[in-house]
């Protein structure tokens, strides 16, 4: 079958990386696992051998022959023919996620996952995206994505995966990442506003926090002059001279709360 470029289909073929992903997920016969993207079923079959139940969300119905083969062999596999971004995940009751994700939905599907109550997720991403997810302050990888994902999950970069592991071969390297869901290490008063602050700051990651906020005041929906007044009011409570890319997530959370209190 010819894979769909529109759907970003690159099927994982290398069994070594399939095995590595499953091993890091530590699947047991008590686990209910969610997979996004069936492919030719290489990952699905291995999950089905270990898990209590495997839900697979797949959009491309041309893959039904692979699905039929798998469901005839494994009674614990259920295929959901739909767009993963539109499926209500709350009723599935999964506790783990293992998937070779379509790269064009990496960001939205990851944040959709993070809204759910799961234990661990072992996911395949484009290499550069994976590095940014795991980015730490004062590194080139540290980004809005780093702070947003690490707000309620620990991110572990497991390994780099070469194009030769897939069919067809993608133009970029990939990586396996493990997310371990947890409670936030710091509190924010309004998560939506916090995300707006992140967007405003990281549009200018090399600037000082004060300059970045003023230049992107529209992102937090505060008029520029009004924001300047707010920053002057709270400058005794925060160091606005620090560069965005050097500022730890918990300090950004504190900044978000200070700003939110002034709205």
Curated annotation (Swiss-Prot):
Its EC number is 2.1.1.-. GO terms for molecular function: RNA binding; rRNA (adenine-N6,N6-)-dimethyltransferase activity. Coiled coil: none annotated. Keywords: Cytoplasm, Methyltransferase, RNA-binding, rRNA processing, S-adenosyl-L-methionine, Transferase. It is an enzyme of class 2 (transferase). PROSITE patterns: RRNA_A_DIMETH, SAM_RNA_A_N6_MT. It is found in: Cytoplasm. S-adenosyl-L-methionine binds at residues 12, 37, 58, 83, 100. GO terms for cellular component: cytoplasm. The keyword Cell membrane does not apply. The keyword Transferase applies. Belongs to the class I-like SAM-binding methyltransferase superfamily. rRNA adenine N(6)-methyltransferase family. RsmA subfamily. This is Probable ribosomal RNA small subunit methyltransferase A. It comes from Methanococcus maripaludis (strain C6 / ATCC BAA-1332).
